[in-house]
UniProtKB/Swiss-Prot annotation:
UniProtKB keywords: Electron transport, Membrane, Mitochondrion, Mitochondrion inner membrane, NAD, Oxidoreductase, Respiratory chain, Translocase, Transport, Ubiquinone
Organism from which the protein derives: Dictyostelium discoideum (Social amoeba)
EC number(s) recorded for this UniProt protein: 7.1.1.2
PANTHER family the record matches: NADH DEHYDROGENASE [UBIQUINONE] IRON-SULFUR PROTEIN 3, MITOCHONDRIAL, NADH DEHYDROGENASE UBIQUINONE IRON-SULFUR PROTEIN 3
Annotated localization: Mitochondrion inner membrane
Protein name: NADH-ubiquinone oxidoreductase subunit 9
Source organism superkingdom: Eukaryota
GO cellular component, one term: respiratory chain complex I
Alphabetized InterPro entries for the sequence: NADH_DH_suC, NADH_quin_OxRdtase_su_C/D-like, NADH_UbQ_OxRdtase_30kDa_su, NADH_UbQ_OxRdtase_CS
EC class of the enzyme, as a word: translocase
Any GO MF annotation of the entry: NADH dehydrogenase (ubiquinone) activity
Role according to the record: Core subunit of the mitochondrial membrane respiratory chain NADH dehydrogenase (Complex I) that is believed to belong to the minimal assembly required for catalysis. Complex I functions in the transfer of electrons from NADH to the respiratory chain. The immediate electron acceptor for the enzyme is believed to be ubiquinone.
């Protein structure tokens, strides 16, 4: 069995040491069961990442992922439209560190590709899906969507249907792009509602009448 109390002690020790080692750079530290989350301003992200990678006490030599969260319609929108989470792994400490920051809509943040080669593709994915621009990136172009794609499909305000219909025309033997044509007006469904609520309501209203 895992010794979670000991793991938490390690995380607290690392967090407090970081706060004292680079004063003024760390905005907030949160201690989770399986990882340590450190929140910083986006302008200080690269400095803190470099320290976590190179300092002998941390040795966060692996960037496993960069996660982007669209904060539209949730409380964190007050801090920034997007939350970026850099998932680091320290084999030396047998722990994961999440370094997080916030970026505005169509915001700019400096690339981390100079520190971690794995971030080259990860940052391209975030640029393609969310529209966050990574300054000084060696090859920032779309990686998942089609050529000439308009918009950023994982933003919450991007229409589910998209803007264009793309298909291969067998007769013309070419790919066709045309505007989306809906046979009925688009509807927003309440996925939180229990199935049959509306029918039960109508049934009860008819009984009352």
């Amino acid at each position: 069995m895992k010794d979670y109390k000991n793991e938490l002690k390690v995380k607290i020790n690392l967090g407090e040491h970081l706060r004292l080692s680079i004063p003024g750079l760390v905005k907030k530290i949160m201690y989770k069961t399986h990882y340590l989350e450190i929140q910083v301003e986006k302008e200080k992200m690269l400095t803190v990442l470099k320290y976590l990678k190179e300092a002998s006490k941390y040795q966060c030599n692996m960037l496993l992922d960069i996660v982007c969260v669209d904060c539209l319609n949730i409380e964190e929108i007050k801090i920034g439209r997007f939350k970026l989470i850099y998932v680091l792994n320290s084999i030396y400490n047998n722990t994961r560190v999440h370094l997080s920051t916030y970026v505005e809509n169509n915001g700019i943040i400096e690339t981390t590709s100079g520190l971690f080669e794995s971030s080259v593709w990860l940052e391209r994915e975030i640029w393609d899906m969310f529209g966050i621009y990574f300054e000084k990136h060696p090859d920032l172009r779309r990686i998942l969507t089609d050529y000439g794609f308009v918009g950023y499909p994982l933003k919450k305000d991007f229409p589910i249907t998209g803007y264009l219909e793309v298909y291969y025309d067998v007769n013309d033997k070419k790919i066709i792009y045309k505007p989306i044509e809906l046979m009925q007006e688009y509807r927003n469904y309440n996925f939180g509602a229990v199935w049959g609520d509306y029918e039960r309501k109508v049934y009860l209203e008819n009984i009352i009448k």
